[in-house]
Each structure stands twice: as C-alpha cells, then as structure tokens.
From Swiss-Prot:
<comment type="similarity">
    <text>Belongs to the bacterial ribosomal protein bL34 family.</text>
</comment>
<dbReference type="Pfam" id="PF00468">
    <property type="entry name" value="Ribosomal_L34"/>
</dbReference>
<dbReference type="GO" id="GO:0005840">
    <property type="term" value="C:ribosome"/>
</dbReference>
<protein>
    <recommendedName>
        <fullName>Large ribosomal subunit protein bL34</fullName>
    </recommendedName>
</protein>
<dbReference type="GO" id="GO:0006412">
    <property type="term" value="P:translation"/>
</dbReference>
<dbReference type="InterPro" id="IPR000271">
    <property type="entry name" value="Ribosomal_bL34"/>
</dbReference>
<keyword id="KW-0687">Ribonucleoprotein</keyword>
<keyword id="KW-0689">Ribosomal protein</keyword>
<dbReference type="GO" id="GO:1990904">
    <property type="term" value="C:ribonucleoprotein complex"/>
</dbReference>
<dbReference type="GO" id="GO:0003735">
    <property type="term" value="F:structural constituent of ribosome"/>
</dbReference>
<dbReference type="InterPro" id="IPR020939">
    <property type="entry name" value="Ribosomal_bL34_CS"/>
</dbReference>
Length: 44
C-alpha cells in the first residue's frame, strides 16, 4: 500500500503557503488568528 504522505515542496507551498492563504477570506482569517496567537511561522 502506498503511504498517504508523499512530500513535495511545490504542492506544500501552493496549498498551505502564504500567498494561498492571502488569496481567500478564510485564509486571511487564519493568518490573523495566527498573528494574534503570536505564532513564529504564519504559513508553510
């Protein structure tokens, strides 16, 4: 059986990257929430 996690830097950036988050309203809310929590890393 093939494992579920097949790492790829491009896919990671496209799905969870900063630009992907900024593209949607929900994503912007995610970033805002992470900022208020004081997260060191906001996105992948």
């Amino acid at each position: 059986m093939k494992r579920t996690y097949q790492p790829s830097k491009i896919v990671r950036k496209r799905r969870h990257g900063f630009r992907a988050r900024m593209a949607t309203t929900g994503g912007r809310k995610v970033l805002a929430a992470r900022r208020t929590r004081g997260r060191k890393r906001l996105s992948a």
